A protein has these predicted regions:
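Short amphipathic alpha-helix segments
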Residues: 14-35
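Extended, charged alpha/beta regions that create polyanion-binding interfaces
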Residues: 58-88
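Short Gly/Ser/Thr- and Asp/Glu-enriched loop/turn motifs at secondary-structure junctions
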Residues: 42-47
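Short glycine-/aliphatic-rich beta-strand segments at the starts of folded cytosolic domains
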Residues: 1-18
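Acidic, two-metal ion nucleic-acid-processing modules in DNA metabolism proteins
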Residues: 20, 37, 78-81
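Short, surface-exposed charged micro-motifs
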Residues: 39, 50
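Helix N-cap motif at beta-to-alpha junctions
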Residues: 52-58
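N-terminal intrinsically disordered, compositionally biased regulatory/targeting segments
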Residues: 13, 51-52
């Protein structure tokens, strides 16, 4: 890994969610701010995501997710790539 590497994170957690639409809006805005690309699926059953960006951006989104106790300690798969794997 070098400083120009793209950090790829993936994780999921089954957790009953009463307000998935509100969460989608909030996390979409945060991902846009951080220039993260990929997919984040949020439903009444939980969360599933595959995101890619800078180390700082991926660290920030994980910290942001963990501000919600329901998303603490999501097991992550972390890989690195030389290019951005997602178009949006």
């Amino acid at each position: 890994m070098n400083e120009n590497s793209v950090v790829n994170i993936a994780g999921y957690k089954f957790e009953p969610l009463e307000n998935p639409v509100d969460l989608v809006r909030m996390y979409q805005q945060k991902c846009d701010e951080l220039k993260l690309k990929g997919t984040m699926l949020i439903s009444k059953n939980g969360i599933n995501f595959s995101l890619a960006g800078t180390q700082q951006a991926t660290d920030t989104i994980i910290a942001f997710l963990e501000e919600d106790d329901r998303f603490l300690n999501i097991p992550l798969k972390v890989t690195y790539s030389e290019t951005q794997p997602f178009r949006r």
